[in-house]
Every structure is written in C-alpha cells, then in structure tokens.
Amino acid sequence: MSDPTTPANQPEHQAPAAGQQPTSQDTGATDWRVPGSGIAPLRHLATSPRDWANYVAIGDSFTEGMSDDENVTAGDWSGWADRLATMLANEHAGEFRYANLAVRGRLLADVAGPQTDAALELVAGATGPTLVSIVGGGNDILRPRADIDALASQLDGAVARLRATGADVLLVTPTDPVGAPIIGATRGRVGQYIAHIFSIAGRHGCYVLNQWDLHFLKDWRMWAADRIHMTPEGHRRVALAGFAALGHTEADEGAFRHPMEFASAPKPTWAEHREWARTHAGPWVKRRVTGRSSGDGRSGKLTELTPWPMG
C-alpha cells in the first residue's frame, strides 16, 4: 500500500488524457461559499523531499524577488524562489531547469488563472519530476472587501489542476502582519486565508511554507524601505525555510531562525514613518484608486524552463 503522505501520489481526481489541460471543472475544486460542494477526502501535508528536475514559481512581487538585489541573474531582482531553485539544483545530479512566471502587483485571479495555465504548459513539456510553488492572495487581502472564501476557491482550483498532472506543489502562506503600519489591520483576513491554505494543502498532498511561523520576519531589517518587500537577508532566510519545508533537513534551522543581533535592530522613528507614507504608501494608494498596478505591462522574468543556475 502506498504512503498517502508521499507527494508523488496522485490526487483523488482522474488525470487528464495526454496533451489535455486539466480544468477546475474536472479536478474537483471546492467552492468554499457552497457548504459541502466538491469536498475531497482528507489527505496529509507532504513532508518527504523528492529529487526534482524542474521548478516553476508562480506568484506576485514576492516570488518575482523584490527587493533582493544580490546576485541577480534574471529580471530586476533575485529573490527567495531563485535562491530555492539553486538549492534544489544542487540536490539534483542532472540538468535542473527553472521558470519564474511571477509578476509584481498581480492578484490571485491572475496567479490561479493565466499563470497557472502557463505553468501547466511547462509541466506538460517537462522531463522529470516538477515542483510548482504558488504565492498569491496577498494583494487581494489588502483590499478591505476581500472575499477570503472566494480566494480559497480560486487557489483550490489552481492546486487541483496542477496536482492532476502529477506535479508537486509548494504553497506559501502570507506573513504575520502584526505591528505593521496600515497592513496590520488585515491580520484577521490573513489568518483566515492561512487556515484555508493548510486545508487545501492537506486535501491535495502539498508542501507548505508557513511564513506566519517565521518570527525573524518581525525584525525590520528583513524588510526593504517600502516595508512590503524583503531585503536580501529576508529572501535568503525564506529560501532556507522553503528548503526545510520541502523536507530537506540539511537546511539547518539555526541558519534562518536565529535572530540577528538585537542591539542593531532599532525601531523606525516617526520621521521614518512619515517618509514611508510619502514615498511608498501614498503611491500605492494612488495606484489602487486609479486601477493601475506596478506590474502593468510586465511578464515573468523566466517564462520558459531554463537551465539553472545561469551563468
């Protein structure tokens, strides 16, 4: 009998025929607004590592890599996903390929829609086991009228489609916004969404990178000047946490969980708060009011599976 915790296990849905793209209609995606609709049998979170030959990252600015300017080899930024790809490549004996379809400012509808469609095409053409990481929903949650149950339905549909191909999936939770200016008010919505993420992961046998549990992210030095995106050190530690979430015990927890020296971690001053509001919060609000996005006109930095590391 197979082990239900093994990520190689297929979901409870029937896989599509060769060359056919699975859709949310034929993968048993759950509509969280309709009690009892499409409820799949409870599975378990995936915890055992695999030897992946390919990694596809989809998401928003976090997965694009803002604001990690260390060792940039693709696009404008490096980021946790690029760093994780390098770690996974080091675990793989043969050629490793990586694609990053994430675009700053994207809502979950784009991540679970067009980006997932593109990821499915890459998975279909890939040779060897493939991992797909999904980050999305954070930009939606910032909106006061965000429907968390509707977001969960979108995410569940994307996960179901990807798992139906046999690809493994790493879901990434939002961070805990406690104490953060303005976005701290979203903490309740964030907690509700994270509960959905764990439920979805349990049903489909996914890995989970739980950023809510990463207490080092409460250190302001992990965050860039905009207080939305991470510094290179923040991305480095999250990549290590992701590697550990994928079952790699070689990722020494002390390497990313141990706090930095407290004495050099001053809290922002009121003057810095005012400067942040002027240079970052104000423009962000203006984009929301005018219906624009920082990612307008942009595409992912690696839209094809590319040998990795580059260079």
Language model regions located:
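Cell-envelope and extracellular/periplasmic
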Residues: S2, A102-R106, G136-I141
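Conserved catalytic region of serine esterases and O-acyltransferases that act on ester linkages
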Residues: S2-P35, D51, R203, D226-H229, ...
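Serine-esterase "nucleophile elbow" of acetyl-processing enzymes
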Residues: D3-R104, D117-G128
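Structural motif
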Residues: N54, T130-S133, D168
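Oxyanion-hole/transition-state-stabilizing segment in secreted/luminal serine hydrolases
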Residues: E64-D68, D110-A150, P177
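Alpha-helical scaffolding segments of alpha/beta enzyme cores, especially the outer helices
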Residues: A150-A164, Q192-S199
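A short helix->loop->beta-strand "cap" motif at the edges of active sites that frequently abuts
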Residues: A164-D168, C206
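Substrate-gating cap/lid alpha-helix
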Residues: G179-W212, P232-H235
